[in-house]
Design a protein with these regions (language model features):
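Compact, glycine-rich, soluble single-domain proteins
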Residues: 2-89
Length: 89
């Protein structure tokens, strides 16, 4: 799936991912390739991304062995047409 993580200041990540684990307001959930359309709010926690290449342009993500993580305070996520957009604070 195409993944885009955006903050008010800049685009944190843009690229392909196999799966994304998110801290939803009502509990953690995972989004996989070709997931059904969804819109959800996010609470403070960690976004875990699997199946990514190291992206030297992203100084906010922590990379290790094809995985990445990002601590957030809150956000909103939308999955539509195999593109996951995460707006974070």
């Amino acid at each position: 799936m195409q993944l885009e993580i955006v903050s008010p200041e800049k685009t944190i990540f843009s690229g392909e991912a196999k799966s994304v684990h998110l801290p939803g307001s009502e509990g953690h959930f995972q989004v996989l390739n070709n997931h059904a359309p969804i819109v959800s709010t996010l609470k403070k926690g960690k976004i875990l991304i699997d199946g990514v290449d190291n992206n030297p342009e992203s100084d906010l993500l922590n990379f290790s062995n094809g995985k990445a993580s990002l601590e957030i305070n809150s956000g909103v996520v939308e999955m539509k047409k195999n593109k996951l957009i995460i707006l974070v604070d």
